[in-house]
A protein has these predicted regions:
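A generic local structural motif
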Residues: 4, 9-10, 57-58, 82-83, ...
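Active-site region of PLP-dependent enzymes
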Residues: 103-109, 116-183
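Buried hydrophobic packing segments
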Residues: 1-5, 36, 136
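Structured loop/turn residues at beta-strand edges in well-structured enzyme cores
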Residues: 17, 65, 114-115, 131
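PLP-dependent aminotransferase-like
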Residues: 16-91, 95-100, 107
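Short hydrophobic "helix-edge" motifs at membrane interfaces and signal-peptide entry regions
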Residues: 30, 89-90, 115, 131-133
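ANL superfamily AMP-binding
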Residues: 1-21
Length: 183
Protein backbone atom coordinates (compact mmCIF):
# COMPACT_ATOMS: atom_id res chain seq x y z
CA UNK A 1 0.00 0.00 0.00
CA UNK A 2 2.81 2.40 0.83
CA UNK A 3 4.50 1.34 -2.42
CA UNK A 4 1.32 2.23 -4.30
CA UNK A 5 1.10 5.60 -2.59
CA UNK A 6 4.67 6.52 -3.45
CA UNK A 7 4.56 5.07 -6.96
CA UNK A 8 1.41 6.99 -7.87
CA UNK A 9 2.83 10.23 -6.46
CA UNK A 10 6.18 9.52 -8.09
CA UNK A 11 5.36 8.36 -11.58
CA UNK A 12 1.75 9.22 -12.32
CA UNK A 13 1.23 12.72 -11.00
CA UNK A 14 4.80 13.92 -10.64
CA UNK A 15 4.62 15.18 -7.06
CA UNK A 16 7.68 13.13 -6.11
CA UNK A 17 10.72 12.96 -8.39
CA UNK A 18 13.22 10.10 -8.66
CA UNK A 19 16.09 10.64 -6.23
CA UNK A 20 13.93 12.69 -3.86
CA UNK A 21 14.82 12.51 -0.19
CA UNK A 22 11.98 11.16 1.95
CA UNK A 23 11.94 11.84 5.68
CA UNK A 24 10.76 8.76 7.58
CA UNK A 25 9.98 8.37 11.24
CA UNK A 26 12.76 6.64 13.20
CA UNK A 27 10.15 4.37 14.79
CA UNK A 28 8.55 2.74 11.76
CA UNK A 29 8.24 -0.53 9.88
CA UNK A 30 10.10 -2.00 6.90
CA UNK A 31 7.00 -1.59 4.72
CA UNK A 32 7.41 2.18 5.02
CA UNK A 33 11.08 2.31 4.05
CA UNK A 34 11.35 -0.49 1.47
CA UNK A 35 9.03 1.15 -1.13
CA UNK A 36 11.05 4.34 -0.88
CA UNK A 37 14.23 2.45 -1.75
CA UNK A 38 12.50 0.35 -4.46
CA UNK A 39 11.44 3.50 -6.29
CA UNK A 40 14.88 5.09 -6.26
CA UNK A 41 14.05 7.55 -3.51
CA UNK A 42 16.37 8.18 -0.58
CA UNK A 43 15.12 7.57 2.98
CA UNK A 44 16.23 10.09 5.61
CA UNK A 45 15.60 8.99 9.19
CA UNK A 46 14.01 11.68 11.37
CA UNK A 47 14.27 11.18 15.12
CA UNK A 48 11.25 10.94 17.40
CA UNK A 49 10.15 12.52 20.63
CA UNK A 50 10.36 9.89 23.37
CA UNK A 51 7.21 11.36 24.95
CA UNK A 52 5.00 10.65 21.91
CA UNK A 53 7.04 8.11 19.90
CA UNK A 54 6.51 10.36 16.88
CA UNK A 55 8.41 13.00 14.99
CA UNK A 56 7.94 16.40 16.60
CA UNK A 57 8.41 19.84 15.08
CA UNK A 58 11.69 20.02 16.98
CA UNK A 59 13.05 16.75 15.56
CA UNK A 60 11.83 17.59 12.03
CA UNK A 61 13.30 21.12 11.91
CA UNK A 62 16.93 20.08 11.16
CA UNK A 63 15.72 18.14 8.09
CA UNK A 64 13.49 20.77 6.47
CA UNK A 65 16.18 21.93 4.06
CA UNK A 66 17.20 18.45 2.90
CA UNK A 67 13.97 16.48 2.37
CA UNK A 68 11.40 16.66 -0.42
CA UNK A 69 8.80 14.42 1.20
CA UNK A 70 7.90 13.66 4.78
CA UNK A 71 6.20 10.32 5.49
CA UNK A 72 4.94 10.53 9.07
CA UNK A 73 4.04 7.39 10.99
CA UNK A 74 1.37 8.20 13.58
CA UNK A 75 2.31 5.51 16.11
CA UNK A 76 -0.46 4.04 18.30
CA UNK A 77 -2.90 6.81 17.37
CA UNK A 78 -0.64 9.63 18.51
CA UNK A 79 0.47 12.51 16.31
CA UNK A 80 2.84 15.03 17.85
CA UNK A 81 1.69 18.53 16.81
CA UNK A 82 0.73 17.25 13.37
CA UNK A 83 -0.92 20.52 12.37
CA UNK A 84 2.34 22.37 13.07
CA UNK A 85 4.21 19.71 11.07
CA UNK A 86 1.73 20.11 8.19
CA UNK A 87 2.35 23.87 8.16
CA UNK A 88 6.12 23.37 8.31
CA UNK A 89 5.97 21.02 5.31
CA UNK A 90 3.77 23.42 3.36
CA UNK A 91 6.10 26.36 4.08
CA UNK A 92 9.10 24.36 2.80
CA UNK A 93 7.26 22.77 -0.20
CA UNK A 94 7.60 19.30 1.30
CA UNK A 95 5.05 16.69 0.22
CA UNK A 96 3.44 15.42 3.43
CA UNK A 97 2.06 11.86 3.57
CA UNK A 98 0.66 10.13 6.67
CA UNK A 99 0.97 6.48 7.67
CA UNK A 100 -2.01 5.72 9.90
CA UNK A 101 -1.76 1.93 10.11
CA UNK A 102 -2.20 2.21 13.89
CA UNK A 103 -4.35 5.35 13.97
CA UNK A 104 -7.73 4.59 12.42
CA UNK A 105 -10.26 6.87 14.12
CA UNK A 106 -7.67 8.89 16.06
CA UNK A 107 -8.20 12.64 16.26
CA UNK A 108 -6.12 15.73 16.92
CA UNK A 109 -8.09 18.87 17.82
CA UNK A 110 -11.31 17.28 16.47
CA UNK A 111 -9.70 16.47 13.10
CA UNK A 112 -9.23 12.83 12.14
CA UNK A 113 -5.72 11.67 11.36
CA UNK A 114 -5.48 11.05 7.66
CA UNK A 115 -6.64 14.58 6.83
CA UNK A 116 -3.37 16.42 7.31
CA UNK A 117 -1.24 15.35 4.34
CA UNK A 118 -1.59 15.03 0.59
CA UNK A 119 -2.49 11.40 1.25
CA UNK A 120 -2.74 8.97 4.13
CA UNK A 121 -2.43 5.21 4.21
CA UNK A 122 -4.35 2.84 6.48
CA UNK A 123 -3.51 -0.84 6.90
CA UNK A 124 -6.04 -3.63 7.42
CA UNK A 125 -3.36 -6.21 8.23
CA UNK A 126 -4.35 -8.87 10.76
CA UNK A 127 -2.41 -7.21 13.61
CA UNK A 128 -3.91 -3.73 13.15
CA UNK A 129 -7.00 -2.02 14.55
CA UNK A 130 -9.29 -3.05 11.72
CA UNK A 131 -8.50 -6.30 9.98
CA UNK A 132 -9.51 -7.82 6.70
CA UNK A 133 -6.50 -10.12 7.12
CA UNK A 134 -4.66 -8.07 4.48
CA UNK A 135 -5.08 -4.90 2.45
CA UNK A 136 -5.65 -1.27 3.26
CA UNK A 137 -6.70 2.06 1.84
CA UNK A 138 -5.28 5.37 0.75
CA UNK A 139 -7.25 8.58 1.31
CA UNK A 140 -6.68 11.96 -0.33
CA UNK A 141 -8.52 15.13 -1.25
CA UNK A 142 -6.25 15.72 -4.26
CA UNK A 143 -8.26 15.09 -7.44
CA UNK A 144 -5.26 14.11 -9.60
CA UNK A 145 -3.96 11.69 -7.00
CA UNK A 146 -7.44 10.22 -6.54
CA UNK A 147 -7.81 9.63 -10.29
CA UNK A 148 -4.39 7.96 -10.47
CA UNK A 149 -5.22 5.76 -7.47
CA UNK A 150 -8.55 4.65 -8.95
CA UNK A 151 -6.80 3.72 -12.18
CA UNK A 152 -4.00 1.91 -10.34
CA UNK A 153 -6.58 -0.14 -8.47
CA UNK A 154 -8.07 -1.16 -11.83
CA UNK A 155 -4.73 -2.08 -13.46
CA UNK A 156 -4.60 1.19 -15.39
CA UNK A 157 -8.14 1.06 -16.78
CA UNK A 158 -10.28 4.15 -16.57
CA UNK A 159 -13.63 2.29 -16.37
CA UNK A 160 -14.24 3.17 -12.74
CA UNK A 161 -13.92 6.89 -13.39
CA UNK A 162 -16.89 9.13 -14.18
CA UNK A 163 -17.49 9.49 -17.92
CA UNK A 164 -16.29 13.11 -18.01
CA UNK A 165 -12.95 12.09 -16.44
CA UNK A 166 -12.66 9.17 -18.87
CA UNK A 167 -13.23 11.51 -21.82
CA UNK A 168 -10.70 14.06 -20.55
CA UNK A 169 -8.02 11.42 -19.94
CA UNK A 170 -8.62 9.73 -23.29
CA UNK A 171 -8.35 13.08 -25.07
CA UNK A 172 -5.20 14.00 -23.14
CA UNK A 173 -3.36 10.81 -24.13
CA UNK A 174 -4.91 10.42 -27.59
CA UNK A 175 -7.04 7.30 -27.17
CA UNK A 176 -9.60 6.98 -29.98
CA UNK A 177 -13.15 5.61 -29.64
CA UNK A 178 -12.17 2.12 -30.81
CA UNK A 179 -9.23 1.81 -28.40
CA UNK A 180 -11.27 3.27 -25.54
CA UNK A 181 -13.24 0.02 -25.38
CA UNK A 182 -10.11 -1.64 -24.02
CA UNK A 183 -9.10 0.94 -21.42
Amino acid sequence: LNLASFEINFSNIGKIKKGAKVGVTALTWATNVTPIIQLGLIPVVVDISIATLNVSPETLTPHLSNIDVFFATNVLGFADKIDVIRKMCKKHNIVFIEDNCESLGSEVDNELLGNFGLAATFSFFVAHHISTIEGGMIVTDDENLYTALVMARANGWDRNLPSDKQAALRKKVGIDAFSAKYT
